[in-house]
Amino acid sequence: MNCKVIACYFGERKEYPSNQKEAVSVLRDVVENEKTLSPGVSQLDTILVNHDCGMKYGNGYLNYIDGEETYAGTIRVLNRPWDNGVGASFGSFNWAFEELRDEYDYWFFQEDDYKIIYDHYYARGIKMLVNDSDLGFVGYDRGSKTDRMYNLDNIFNYFN
């Protein structure tokens, strides 16, 4: 069994999406992507972890989509306590793992304002893990013309 955990937060942020209305708009796009993009595996549940800060509009949206089908699985919504914001998205990733660790073999963790755009991304990650026993995880990140606009080439070159 496979899952993707997306950490959701509807409170105020420093950058876009900066409020719950914008966050829901971005998340709608992410969810639509989950319904149309092939992960390359026959089963992949999408787990949305709500770091619940009491935003009714955002919480209502998550309640509405809970149980919807995706390209290869089902949307599951987990609500974790606010706890004064401790842990942020990593706290949400950990929350999901602790709650569901026995249900899934492979895990993918993603922020709510990211969108994977390449077909078969999940299958490719599993293949890397299976074929190289020295790997403990596979990290996915961007690398595009947009990134070059922000002069990130030096960062990318550092790791080459």
PLM regions: where:
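Short beta-strand-to-loop acidic/aromatic patch adjacent to the donor-nucleotide binding site
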Residues: 104-117
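Phosphate/oxyanion-binding active-site loops and adjacent basic polyanion-contact surfaces
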Residues: 16-27, 84-93, 118
